[in-house]
Every structure is written in C-alpha cells, then in structure tokens.
Amino acid sequence: MEQDELRDQLVDPKSPINIESLLDTITALVNDCKIPVLMRMKSVDNFISRYERVVESLAALRMKAADFRQLKVIGRGAFGEVHLVRHTRTNTVYAMKMLNKDDMIKRADSAFFWEERDIMAHANSEWIVRLQYAFQDPRHLYMVMEYMPGGDLVNLMTSYEVSEKWTRFYTAEIVEALAALHSMGYIHRDVKPDNMLISISGHIKLADFGTCVKMNANGVVRCSTAVGTPDYISPEVLRNQGQDAEFGKEVDWWSVGVFIYEMLVGETPFYAEALVSTYTNIMNHKTSLKFPDEPLISTQAKDIIKKFLSAAPDRLGRNSVDDIRNHKFFVNDEWTFATLREASPPVIPSLKSDDDTTHFEEIETRDRDNAGDFQLPKTFNGNQLPFIGFTYSNEYSPVKNLLKGHGAGSKQNGIEQHKPQTVVEQPLTNGHASGVPEEKYEAVKMELDSKNREFELLKDSIARNEIRAKMIENEKNSLSTKISDLERELKDNKDKLRHGADSDAKVNELAVELRMSKEYNSEMESELSKFRDKCEQLKEDLRKKSGELAQEKNETQRVFQQKKDADEAFAEIKRDYELLQTRENEKSVQLKKALDERKENGAYQQSVAKATDAEWERKMQFYEKQLEHANDERKREEQKRTAAEFDQSRVARKLAGIEANYELLQNDYKSMKEARKDLERDLQDVITEKRRLEIRVEQLMDSRNTDERVLSLCQDELVESQEEAKYKEDGLRGKIDGFKHELENEKMKTQTLEENLLVADKERGMLKMEVQELMQRHKWEITNKDQTLKHLETQLDEIKQQSKIESSEQESNDKQTIADLRKKLDLEKAHKKAVINKLEEEMAKRQPLKKGEKGVTKSALIKKEREIMALEQERDTMSKRIAALFYENDKQAEHFNIAIQDMQTTQDALRDELKECKEELANRNVNTRYEDKRSLDSREGIPSSLSNQHIQMEGWLSLRDNTKKSRKPKWTNCFVALNEYSFTIYVDEKAVSVILLIEAGAMAHVRHVTAADLRNVDDSQLPKIFHIMYDDASCNSSRHASNSDLSMIESFREESWKRHDFQELSYHIRTFCDVCNKKLSDIIRPTPAFECKNCHFKTHKDHVAQGSLPMCRYNTGLSRELVLMAPQTDNCNKWVSQLRRFIESSRSAAVSVSRVSSRRHAPGSSNSSTIYQ
C-alpha cells in the first residue's frame, strides 16, 4: 500500500517529489556545491566526484535548448524574450519564452514564473495557451508554448476597423477565458489586448500569466502593490497602493470594460500622456468616462461598459460570470456561449507557412549577454534551489514512460518492467563464466541495439508518412468539393449562356478540362489507395517483426539464464568432488596409520582395528556413491550446456533472418518515399490546374454579369437617357457660360481676393473637365444605347418568333424550371451570404500603412464625407454670392487703400519713435533716480533685462499633436523663433502663418522630459524632448484646485506641499528626483516617490516630509503645456538653456512690466499669449 502511494507521488506531475523534481534536485545541488570553497570539504568533494558525471549525463539526456532551432524573436520583455522555435526531432513550431534566472532572484516577487508555469501546464481549457515543455539550464528558464500565428488583438485593431459585431464576439471569448482562469483560483491582473492571442483558427486564447496571483478560500487576494498596465488598472488597486488591502476577481472585469471601449472607440477611456493624469482619470471614472459622438455606440454596449467600469461593489461579474453572459450586449442570432468555440470567427489569419510571423511586429535580434551569469560565490548561496521542480514535459517525460510501463504489466513485475528493455544487458556480463566468448556477446548486443534504433526510426518514418497521407487525402477531398462546385457553376453558366456561340465554346473547353481533372483525380485516388495498402502491409510486417524480436529477446534471456544456472551447478559439483577426494585421501592415511598401530599393539588392537576398519569401509562406500552421483550430475550439466550452445546458434540464425527482413522493409520504405514524392508532384499539378479553372470560371462569370446588367438596364434607360443627356448638356452649357463670365470678372478684383478667385478658377477648370467628360460619356452612351436598342429589337423579334414555337414546350417545363430556380435561389443565397461575410472582413480591413503613418478610422471617413458635403454646399453658396462680392469689392478696395495709407503713416511714425527711444536709451545716466533708470524698452512694456541679454534663437522643432490619443504619438514639424520679446511657433520658415505666440512674462517653466512623462516614446527620442508650461489669460480663470488625491495621504498639509497636487508613484523606468537629482527608479524595488499632477515635479517622499520643495509653477485654469522635440540632443539642451534665461529675465522684470502695462493699457485689453487658428 505504501509502495503504491509512493509510486503515485513519483509519477504525479503536480507532486513536489515527482521524478522531474528529483532530477532537478540532484542537478541543482551539484551546480550549487561545485565551488572551490566548498570542495575543500571532503564530504562535498566526494559528493561532487560521485554525481558530477551523472549530472552531465542527465543534462545530455533531458530536454535542452539545443533540441530547438531558433527562428525569430517575436517578443521581448524586462526579464526575457519570446522566440519562435522549431523542434529538431518532431519539426513542430513552438513559441519559447526564455527567462534569466539572475533577474528572477533579484526581483521582489520572483516566484511569479511558478504561477505562469502551473496555469499553462495544468489548465485543461481551450481558452488558455497550453504549455508543452518547461526546462532549465544553469542560467535560464525555458517555457515552450503552443504558437499562436495570428498575433495579438492589438495587431488586429491596427489592421481592421473593428465593428460592434466583432467586439461582441471577442469579448465573449475573453469572458470564457477569464472564467476558466478564475475557476482555477487565479486572478490575472493584466488583462489587455496585448495578452489576447489569435490562434490559427481565428479564436483567441489568454496568455502572459506572469502577473497572476492565487486567491484564498474567500476568493480574494491581499496585496500592497499596484500590478498591471496603467490604462487597464482598476481604481481599487490604485487606491490601496502602498497599503495591504484585499480585492477579488472584479479587477479583471474592470479591464474587460476598458478593452470593450478600446475596441469600439480605438483608444482607452482614461488615456493621458502623463502617467499621473491617467491615474487621476481612473480615480475619477464617474466623471471622466465619456463616449464620443463618432463612432456610434449602441445602448447595450454603453450599458455593459458602464457596468464594468463602475465601483467594485457594483461591478458586473463580481457575483457570478453568468451575470455577464446574460447581458443584452451578447444577444445575437449567430452564436451562444455554448456554441462559441464552433462559431466562425470574424477574421481567420492568412498564413504562408507554419512559421509565418507576418502578424507580429518586427523585433530586433540581440546577441546574448553573458555578463548576467551568476558570479562565483564565496560560500554556498543556493542560486539553483528556487528552481527545483520547474521542469515539465507534456510528451517526452520519464513520468509518461513510467505510467506506460506500469499500465502494461502487473504490480508484482512492475519494477522489472520499468527498467530499460535493452538487449540482454545483465547476461552479457557473465560471458566468461558461461564459457561463451565475450567478444561474440558484445557484437550481438551492438547488433541488436542498432536494429532497435533503426526499427524506431522506421516506425517514426511510417508515422510521418501516415500524416502526409492524411494531408493528401484532405487535399483530395477539398479538390473534389471545389470540382463539384465548379461543375455546378459550369452547369449554371451553360444554362445562362446557351444562346452565345463563344460562351458555348468556352463552356465546352471548361467541361473538357474538368473531365480531365476528374480523371486525373481518380488516378490520384487509385494511387493513394495503393499507397495506403503499402502502408498497411508495412505496418503489419513491422508488427510481426516486432513480435518476433520480442520472442527472440525472451528466448535469448532464457538461454543465458540456463547457461548461468548450469555453470553454477557444475562449479558446485566440482567443489564437492574435490572435497570428497580430499577426505578420501585423509581417510586412507588414517587407515594406514591404524594398521601399523595394530601390528604393534597386539591382539587387542587387532579387534579394535577390525571394528574401525569395518566402519571406515562403510564410510568409503558411502563417499564412493556420492562421488558417482556427482559425476552423473556433471555429465547431465554438460549435456545441458551443449543444448544451450545449440539454442544460441539457433538464435543467431533467426537474427540473420530478421536482418534480411529488415533490408526488405528498407527497400519497401524507399519505394514508398518515391511514390509519395510522385503523389506530391501530381497534387501540385492538380492544384495548378484547379487555379487555372477558377480563373476561367471567374472570367466567364464577369462576362455573364456584364451581359445581365446591360440587358436589365438598357430597356429602362433607353428613353430617359436621350432626354437626360440633352437636359444636362443645356445645363452644363449654361454653367460654362456663367463660369466664363465669372472668370472675366475675377481678373478685375483686388489682391485681397486673389486666393479665393484662384480656388474658383481651379474649380472652374475641374468643372470644365467634368463637363467635357460628361459630354463625351453621354455621347458614347447615346451611341451605345442606339446600337443596343437596334440589337434588342432584333432579338425581340427573334424571341417573339421563338416564343410562339416554344410556348407549347414551355408549359411542360415550367414546374421543373421553378424547382431548379428555387434550388439556384437557395444556392445563390448561401453564396451571397458567404460573399457578404468576406466583404465585411475586407471592408473592415485597413490598407497597409507606411512606417510612421496612421490608419484611417471609420470616424475619420465619416468626417471626410461631411467635409465633402460641406464643401459642395459652400461651393454652391459661393457661386450665388460671388456676384454680390464683386459689387462690394469696389467699395472695399477703396477702404483698403485708405487703411493701407494710414498704416504706412503710422508705421513711419513708430519707426521714428523707436529710433528716438534707442538714442535716448544710449544716453541714459545710470546714477539717476529709479524712475529714470527704467529703459525706454521697459516703458514700452519690454523688460530691460531681456533686451540687454540679446536672447535670440531659431530653428526647426517637432510639436507633439495632442488632438487624438493613440498608442504612437504624432509629431508635426514647425519653425520656432525666440527673441527677447516672445517665443513664436510658425508653420514654416517664412514666418508668415503663426501657430502660437508666447510673450515675455507668460513663460512659466521649461524642463527635460523623462520616460515617466511620455509613454509610448522611444528611448532614443527622450533626450531630444523638452516640456514648456506657459500662462494663457484668455482661458478660463477659475483657480479651484483638484479635489482628487490618489495617494490618500492626508497627513500632509497643502501649505507644506507648496501648492503641489502630489500622487504617490513607483517608477520602474529611468527617472531622477528634481530636488536632489538622485535616481527615483529601480526595476526591482523602486523607492517611494511623489509626482505633481499639474507641473509634473518629481521628488523623493522624504523631501515632501521635510518641506524643502519649490513652489508649483502651474497656474490652475490658466496654464497650458507644450511638448517639443529637437533634431539632436545638443540642440535640445541649447533650447532649454535659452528658454530658462528667457524665463529668469522675464521674472526679474515682472514688477516693472506690470507697472508699465497698467499705465499703457486698460485692464484686460491684452493677453499674455495669443493662439492663431
């Protein structure tokens, strides 16, 4: 009973003492103890000496990275990479995740890989990615998973415009995947489209379980860190950051709500460029969740999003997943949750091969860094111990082999059957004792081993051939189906094109080609049947030979056992015989001595000697009988030995027969391979022929559709076309005359209307070309319609005559025709439905984009259509108003001339005044009174510090576009100029069209950005980007501060924060403190830090407690932000330096500027910044 329990634990993959774990244990101990310091101890040195070669042998026999050929890198994370690999033995493609052990040990939650391994290995669900193998070496962990060639849902959203129908389908599948994960007792915590992979069939599976955590008996988890992607993280997780709190599986359902919103709208609902702003929106989700006008979202979709993105106690799915399944959003006529797996997915990925990676982003391949190996420790540290038991195999595992061996035999012989069944290993060790030459037995052993290996290879080859035969059969079935479809279409084409001689010829050719294809297909079927028969015959021969080989093995074992027993018995008899001879010699000597003593002692001794002699004679007789019996036994054993040698020779003869049969099997296998190659070539020819026939049928269908359209439309449009063409011609002539008159009048207009007139001229040219095209098209249509009308009249006469003849026959064929038409109608409906589904996919599919170019969304297309309609209306309105504009232009020209003269006069006066001011500035006495110290520039509202420092810089920068949220930012090139008066952004270097002007004194802050400020930006771009904050008095001047405080730390007063609105964050990307310039970030254990939600000021938590902070530069309600990128890092540093000088100079003159401004301008008459639309 205890042995059975122990055996069950050894073969149970979930047991901590299974065979794989024990092998990991001995390997880890040897690797951890093999250091010079420990090997000085004799016990450790003996342990290493005993097991070092054993571990090396285990490493060679167990699964390793060398068993897979790496094809491409398809994913990269902070702790490892995901490679596309191919198994060298089975030629199967997998995705292999490789993790660095050193990074795993340094990480705080280093046990995360156990959850990922256990979920994928033991999850019996079709919605979760399956683990095939897990193994390790001294440096890395490897997880080999099934390959999902369709990529992730992020790739699908960038390639297609996702509709609500598609969103419903994919949401239902992710609900089923999460339900399966929750039933195992785990919470995912990082549900997002990046972790939803598309299989070869188009269905999705959940992946990336590194963030999963096990729930307790109450279905909750206690955690103090915020884990997950910022855009998808739930508010209760953010609220309890840094505090030990409980939450359940409802955090995953929040992420599902964000996922639905992103699928429908194209962006996440709470997205913001700065991480702290994203967290603020999530915490204020009740007010920040808004739905755009475009695209249109149904009421059911909005309802399920709101229920998912609600407070944790009220969130949909908190009580049961059935509440989600019963929501009205999932009601449809195509599938239910019970039939979801069998339903047809919206998109099935198109693949060129089994290792196609077109649905994955291109990732640069990096060389492996050997610097991350474990450093040689000074004492035992057990680096390999945390990974004991990680190894797992779904197929090639000793556990599987033990289970198979145990199932084949009885419990008593189970241990013997579990041993490797190589050819008679133990009897061969006794070659000399049995009298058989050892060299002969070694040769026989090697022969049988080689035959075993060849036998296994032959079995594998036959299995692969069977798979290939099934593939050929499936291809044959698909060809048969397509040929039958072509026959149906050919029949329809014959019925519809029977009146045309050319069509009949084409149909006849197609029929001949189809008949030849069918004949060829039948030949292929006969070849395939012969191929199957050969495979079955070879399999039967293999079964027979394997049975004979097993019998021969048993017979050989029996013979060698008999030899061993005979040798042992012969040796024992020989020892007994020698012992008896020794005793007989001793007795003879004693007898001789006794006779001598009897002669010497007299009569008394003679009587005693007689009795002794009689006793010795009896003993001698007894020993002689035993000796004769031993001789008989020795003869019998020699006979047995002779029989055993005869049996051995018989086994050798049978082995020779097996070798001959094996050569025959090899020849059959070679012929079978050649036949398979011939079949593959024939199959390729059939596929080529099928494609040619499909092209032919498509051409015939196109010509048939064209004829049908002409016949159906000509009769209706023939009468109307002439009148419509005449009416359009008269109207277009009138328009041409009108545009000619307008063109003559436009030449007399002033310079201010030249741009509008140029647009009108272009429109006139376009309309003229359209008129000409319309005239030519209508003339051609009239000619074509006339010819068609004559042809139709001729056909009509022929049809009338023919109809009289066929009227009698038509009545009898009506019923049959109606039945045929109904069948055709059903077929056409099915065909149309398939075409509609395909068209939906093609219409949703986006065009391939160039690098850096954004796709056109449905909302953008709708906006473009509206803009086109608005432009058309504007064109009509403009044509109506142009006459009035011409009349008003003369009056306006006079006013413009007068205004220009006034402006020139004013400009000359200002120039003179500026010249006088500069002269007066040069003659100023520095030691005069304070009022006289002010420069003329200051009196004019320009800070003297700015004018004296000669701040001037210009160049090209890239302005970040914040109009639309997206995963990849969009940058717009612009020309920027900085002088002592303002900071101006122009459209181009001509400096005519102004985008933004920031005057002196309005600039509040400038700084370099970090990775925490801008997400989705390449690391190479970060040193080139800087952030500007400025005041805009034209905006709303409300100054109420934000009430949301995500950190929930109320012990700090607002006065000590210096108007900052802080959020507690943990930085895992490179970030520095703005107070002490020390690092805030760490990949493993980041230090506690704060970031201001307004000015993005970053600092250590200790600085906030000490109160050593500068004042927040953000003016609530008035401040605006800009993000600019320079071409080079040095250029960015120069811009930041000049802008800081600009800000410092404007602040030093703020008092004087405010006084001058109060004298020269009325309150509210000027703005600090002006934005030009």
UniProtKB/Swiss-Prot annotation:
Necessary cofactors: Mg(2+)
Active site: 190 (proton acceptor)
Name listed for the protein in its UniProt record: Rho-associated protein kinase let-502
All residue ranges annotated as the PH domain in the record: 950-1144
Chain ranges of the AGC-kinase C-terminal domain: 331-402
UniProt note: phenotype after gene disruption: Loss of both zygotic and maternal expression causes defects in embryonic elongation and P-cell migration, loss of only maternal expression results in abnormal early cleavages, loss of only zygotic expression results in sterility.
Residue ranges of the region described as Disordered: 1154-1173
Biased composition (Polar residues): 1164-1173
Stretches assigned to coiled coil: 438-709, 735-928
GO annotations of cellular component type: adherens junction; cleavage furrow; contractile muscle fiber; cytoplasm; cytoskeleton; nucleus
Occurrences of domain Protein kinase (ranges): 68-330
Assembly information from the UniProt record: Interacts with rho-1.
Tissue-specificity statement: Expressed in the lateral hypodermal seam cells at the onset of the elongation phase of morphogenesis (at protein level).
PROSITE patterns in UniProt: AGC_KINASE_CTER, PROTEIN_KINASE_ATP, PROTEIN_KINASE_DOM, PROTEIN_KINASE_ST, RHO_BD, ZF_DAG_PE_2
Keyword annotations from UniProtKB, A to Z: ATP-binding, Coiled coil, Cytoplasm, Cytoskeleton, Developmental protein, Differentiation, Kinase, Magnesium, Metal-binding, Nucleotide-binding, Oogenesis, Phosphoprotein, Serine/threonine-protein kinase, Transferase, Zinc, Zinc-finger
An example Gene Ontology biological process: nematode pharynx development
Any GO MF annotation of the entry: zinc ion binding
